[in-house]
Regions:
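Bacterial Sec-dependent N-terminal signal peptides
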Residues: 1-31, 369
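Intrinsically disordered/low-complexity terminal segments and short unstructured peptides
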Residues: 16, 206-210, 219, 334, ...
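A short, polar/charged loop/turn motif at coil->beta-strand junctions and beta-hairpin connectors
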Residues: 20, 37-40, 153, 340, ...
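Sequence/structural signature of beta-propeller domains
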Residues: 22-329
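Short, ordered beta-strand-loop transition motifs
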Residues: 5, 112, 346-350
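C-terminal outer-membrane/trafficking sorting elements
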Residues: 330-369
Length: 369
């Protein structure tokens, strides 16, 4: 009966949230175990009347936790902040000067104890533009009641590539450990390349030359028909992000011709490793199994080591916002150490909680203080 009751409760929780992924908790008689794989659920829907139609980059706010910054890829350049529900706009940031028109990705990071937002103004589909820059500015606080709209004068880092060529790009990420900005090219029938530049405040108007870091995947894996092997070459990269503590790297691609060729790759950084060493060591990481194709899915960002978000451009409606979670390791460790502890269920305010021994956890493995 005990097993049956908990199983029914877990089933109810899956129905309640609209999440059809496997539950994070599995109960076998007297043994409570965690399913440590990532799972996805829709946490919100982006109201395009309140927010942005063409979302090409997102970043979780570090100054005002609980909000997500979203970057517009429309002709009018601005960013907005909303919650993971996406139903209301909390803040709009306008820019006092225009810097290029094709903005493709955004990221957040810390430099000299100050939070910055970075925007990649580097889209070049035809590879004929040659004008590329990284827009950056201090992240503003979000106060929807008093300052729903503000203006900022951004800075920029102008750059060229070390090979002297033009490149199309849609992915940018910032590493808090090395304080380096990474840019990933978007290509169709070849491997994508990673370039970098250390973040500094004193570049001024001088054009900088990026440093080549590495290829993503192995070029020899592509073969004659590269479009049939997008995984190993991992082309069409549209978004990337590094977790705040630098331990994990997400790289997302998007193939709107063959939906099953769209993935998210998760790279785990070893102790003392650089980003380059991690990407080259894990040449063929497994795609996250919980991910499903998103229409024009071009945005991804970390909240913490155990939570990240994706969303996409609007098609013929309001695009969903997806939240990806896995259990915190403390929950896994406690359960492993005490597999026969009493398990109890509590239904509180529509949220199912699991008590394992003394501590209380949500279904996602978050410890309730």
């Amino acid at each position: 009966m005990k097993k049956l009751l908990l199983s029914l409760s877990l089933a109810f929780f899956g129905f309640y949230t609209g999440c059809n992924a496997a539950p994070s908790l599995v109960y076998y008689g007297d043994t409570l175990e965690w399913n440590t794989e990532w799972k996805r659920k829709q946490c919100g829907t982006l109201d395009i009347n309140e927010n942005i139609i063409e979302v090409s980059g997102i970043a979780c706010s570090r100054v005002t936790p609980g909000y997500i910054w979203m970057q517009s890829d429309e002709k009018e350049k601005y960013i907005i902040a909303t919650t993971e529900k996406g139903d209301k706009r909390a803040c709009k940031v306008n820019f006092t000067k225009t810097i290029r028109w094709d903005w493709e990705d955004m990221s957040g990071g810390v430099y000299n104890d100050t939070n910055y937002l970075f925007i990649g103004a580097f889209g070049d589909n035809e590879e004929t533009d040659g004008e590329y820059s990284i827009v950056y500015f201090q992240e503003p606080a979000i106060d929807p009641e008093n300052t729903p709209e503000i203006s900022i004068t951004p800075n920029r880092i102008k750059y060229v590539y070390p090979d002297g060529k033009n490149h199309n790009n849609e992915a940018l990420m910032y590493d808090n450990i090395d304080q380096v900005i990474y840019i990933i090219t978007k290509v169709y029938y070849d491997v994508c390349q990673v370039f970098s530049i250390p973040f500094r405040l004193d570049y001024g108007d001088e054009t900088q030359t990026l440093t080549y870091v590495c290829d993503l995947g192995v070029r020899s894996d592509l073969g004659e028909h590269a479009q049939n092997k997008p995984y190993k070459g991992f082309h069409l990269v549209t978004a990337a992000d590094i977790s705040p503590d630098g331990k994990y790297i997400l790289i997302k691609n998007h193939n709107n011709i063959v939906a099953t060729y769209s993935w998210i790759l998760l790279f785990t950084r070893g102790e003392g490793e650089s980003v380059a060493e991690t990407l080259q060591r894990e040449r063929h990481p497994e795609p996250l199994r919980c991910y499903n194709y998103e229409w024009q899915g071009e945005a991804i960002c970390w909240l913490d080591d155990y939570t990240f978000y994706t969303t996409s451009d609007a098609d013929d409606g309001n695009p969903p916002i997806y939240k990806y979670t896995k259990p915190y390791p403390e929950a896994v460790e406690q359960t492993a150490a005490d597999p026969h502890s009493a398990a109890a269920k509590v239904l509180s305010n529509g949220t199912l909680l699991i008590r394992n021994g003394i501590n209380l956890y949500t279904i996602d493995g978050r410890k309730v203080e």
